[in-house]
C-alpha cells in the first residue's frame, strides 16, 4: 500500500527516476547490483495496520511537529524543544524530502547547533531519497563527514 501511495504522490521519484537509474546503471555492474538490492528492499514492505496508517497521514497533513502541537507521552514535541545537535542531509532535487521541508525545521531550532549537508545524487540507487544510505558518492563523500560530525558532536 505504501508503495502505491508513494507512486501516486510522486510518479517522477517512484517510477520515472528509478527506471532512468536502472538504464544508467546497466553498464556498471556495481551500480546495477546496488540498484537491484534497493529494488528488492522495496518489495519487503509489510502491510501497515490501518490505525497506524491513519495516524501517519494525520501527522503529515497536520504538520503537528513543526506547528508545536504534537504531544507524545504528555510532552510537546516541537523543533523548539530539540536540545541535541542536529545533522540534516538534503538532496536539492528531491521532491520526496525537499530542502524546503528541512530548512524551516533547522531554522526553528532553539540554537544554531546544526549542520546541513547536500547530497548530489548517485547512479545505482533506484530511489533517489535512498541514495544517501546506499550510494557510492554518499559513502565516499557524505559518510566521512557525517561520522566526523558524530565524533565531534558528542
Tell where the protein language model's regions lie, with residue ranges:
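Hydrophobic alpha-helical scaffolding
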Residues: 43-47, 92-95, 136
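Short beta-strand/loop motif that positions the catalytic acidic residue
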Residues: 82, 88-90, 94
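C-terminal catalytic-base region of ester-bond hydrolases, centering on the histidine
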Residues: 55, 67, 92-93, 106-107, ...
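Short alpha-helix in the alpha/beta-hydrolase fold that links the catalytic acid
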Residues: 84, 98-108
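Active-site nucleophile elbow and catalytic-triad environment of alpha/beta-hydrolase enzymes
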Residues: 56-78
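Terminal low-complexity/disordered tails
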Residues: 93, 98-102, 143, 147-148
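Alpha/beta-hydrolase-fold enzymes
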Residues: 1-51
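Catalytic active-site module of serine/aspartate enzymes centered on a nucleophile-bearing elbow/loop
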Residues: 112-154
